[in-house]
Amino acid sequence: MPEDRFRSPFAQFFRVATGLFLVALFCLGASQVDEQLTARRRVFPSIGAGLRAIRRDASGKYYLLASPSVGVATFDSKGKQLASIGAADSTNGAASNRSAIVFGEDCDIDSQGNIFVADRGLNQVSVFSPDGKLLRSFPVSGPTSLAVLPEGEVAVTSNRSPHLIVVYGSNGKVVRESGDPEEISPRDDLNRYLSIGRLASDSQNRLYYGFTYFPEPLVRLYDRFGYAGQDFRFTGLDAYPEAIAARKEIEHQEKKIQPPVFKPILTAFGVDPANGDVWMCLHNTLLHFDKDGNRQSEYQIYTPSGARLEATTILIEPDRLLIGSDPLGLFDFERPDRKH
């Protein structure tokens, strides 16, 4: 049979040698980092443990979501705290406070300054006015991320939805759904878990979906109406060691009957509103892609004291990167692409 040639001793030796050579290349590639980045300073020092998201509105005001106790803390452009929205009543409990955020996973701000919160604790999306009044809410089972769209719409992710993105209208009803789980495993439940992700948007109201657990870090661009476009994918030699380990873990869990559990790979990402560049965080590794999906640079990030910064949120600004971690808080980094 034709396949017998692969069973000869020489062929087996060749396959093993090739495999070892590729592994060596992967290991060499994994150590190739353009620069070590150290934060200039910590910002918004009152926020640390429970940090989930940071947003900025057109006026320069910042919104920091920390769960479960803080809610959404607002700051002016100079970093002075203004208010705390949706914080639970510590004396009477969250159940007695109708406007409380029980466990917010993500937030976003519309053009009127209204604050949208994906509240996994209440299984709903809550909408607050700029002064913190609860305007409305609608049910979503296990929301994990959201992004505000024009005309009162909001895109939401939930690992309990068959599609990756569900868009709700201003009345809280489903308008459209888009995105199917990636097919990595024969098991549908593993595919759905591995396709869990988070959302970001840009100035053109396009959506970016970042796959949290995908073996090869991936962010996919969608237009407002759910049509997929550019992929931002980390697939160089330096991406392979972790990808190989992740795929081996997938194979291992395929044999189990218990519900799948995986460690996050893409821990945060953000979009530059000026040019559409994408920045990915893989724990303390920072990747920069241009708007066409070409990787530009790779960095490792540290706090001013030299500790690894395991990023969980990032905000791209014209003159700096704000990168945050739970529980270390938020840090100000000089933009490495603007140094030269």
Regions found by a protein language model. Give the residues of each.
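Sequence-pattern detector for short linear motifs
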Residues: S8-F10, T18, F44-P45, D223
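N-terminal secretory signal peptides that target proteins for export/translocation
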Residues: M1-Q12
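Bacterial N-terminal signal peptides
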Residues: V16-C27
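Eukaryotic scaffold repeat domains enriched in small/polar residues
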Residues: G29-H340
